[in-house]
């Protein structure tokens, strides 16, 4: 039996929103006042607070998803009118929770950064990734695990089991970098891609603004931005390595990475190479929402000097998950990726000089 009056209503609101809590999400909420990743594939999140009122405790805050480019919804609570005294008490309580959560988040982010530095140093710059081999790609700006390692994160609550992740030899290691931070503080976390393709992030870091640059951007008139690492490698092949690519990791992070890249390179043209999530539907409405294109369009509109492209597939057997330029390369060939990208870049050169 939960200690929150509106516990089941909150779970119902999350389910109606489209969040499917998994076994790993047992014990909801795992934290109070801190953002917690949840749902299928870790694509959703929640951030809740506790409020005491008339001797009862309620959950407030909200939840959201990266699948919709960062869609967010507040928890709906039916409140009776508040007295000034009660309102002031609740505001003070929430502020205390916010400050405590910020302190915990800062501590966790620092632990993630320290772990990233240590594990990055231990990883080898030379190696083989079965994941990349299957895709026919060569790694760039990455490292490899020369021997297996085990990651362990303490349980959030007493009585729960620690999280244990085993990473075998051949795991690909990718740095998540804040390029606007001082060099000594730029590495924030790591993403591991195991030989079977499973992806694991270090726990506790803050993803917004983190990216990975493929290639040199200082002497290029054009900077490209995409979601995934394999997508970035295929784009680099498609332009024969002439232009750099920033990997933003997911659609939601484009809204943070693209403005950051614009600030770093104010005189360069930007090109977002979006995913075409042609079979992604909003679970709340049942409508096609295509977060890859939808988010990229908004970012391209909001950020000056930014253009947009997405892969155009012509094969009849395109799968539901064939969405990006890496999928296009595998289905239709590198020459198709090259034609679509270089043709647009030539047009941009004629328009913008």
Locations of the language-model features?
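Non-catalytic accessory segments of DNA primases and related replication-initiation nucleases
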Residues: 1-131, 277
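Extended, non-catalytic subsegments within catalytic or DNA/protein-binding/adaptor domains
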Residues: 73-169, 177-203
């Amino acid at each position: 039996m939960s200690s929150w009056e509106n516990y089941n209503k909150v779970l119902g609101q999350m389910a109606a929103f489209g969040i499917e809590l998994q076994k790993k999400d047992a014990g909801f909420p795992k934290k109070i006042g801190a953002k917690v990743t949840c749902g299928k594939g870790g694509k959703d999140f929640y951030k809740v607070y506790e409020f005491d009122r008339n001797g009862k405790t309620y959950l407030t805050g909200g939840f959201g998803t990266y699948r919709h480019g960062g869609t967010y919804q507040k928890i709906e609570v039916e409140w009776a009118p508040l007295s000034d005294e009660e309102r002031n008490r609740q505001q003070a309580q929430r502020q205390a929770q916010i400050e405590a959560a910020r302190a915990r988040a800062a501590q966790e982010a620092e632990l993630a950064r320290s772990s990233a530095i240590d594990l990055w140093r231990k990883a080898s710059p030379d190696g083989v990734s079965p994941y990349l081999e299957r895709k026919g790609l060569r790694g760039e700006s990455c490292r490899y695990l020369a021997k297996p390692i085990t990651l362990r994160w303490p349980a959030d609550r007493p009585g729960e089991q620690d999280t244990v992740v085993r990473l075998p030899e051949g795991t690909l290691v990718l740095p998540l970098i804040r390029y606007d931070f001082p060099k000594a503080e730029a590495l924030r976390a790591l993403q591991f891609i195991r030989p079977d393709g499973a992806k694991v992030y270090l726990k506790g870091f803050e993803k917004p603004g983190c990216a990975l640059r493929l290639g040199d951007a200082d002497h290029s008139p054009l900077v490209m931005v995409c979601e995934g690492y394999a997508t970035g490698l295929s784009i680099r092949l498609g332009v024969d390595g002439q232009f750099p690519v920033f990997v933003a990791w997911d659609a939601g992070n484009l809204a943070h990475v693209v403005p950051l890249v614009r600030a770093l390179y104010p005189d360069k043209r930007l090109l977002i190479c979006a995913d075409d999530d042609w079979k992604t539907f909003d679970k709340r409405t049942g409508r096609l929402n295509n977060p890859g294109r939808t988010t990229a369009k908004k970012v391209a509109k909001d950020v000056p000097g930014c253009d947009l492209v997405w892969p155009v597939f012509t094969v009849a057997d395109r799968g539901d998950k064939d969405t990006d330029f890496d999928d296009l390369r595998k289905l239709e060939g590198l020459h198709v990726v090259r034609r679509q990208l270089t043709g647009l870049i030539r047009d941009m050169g004629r328009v913008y000089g």
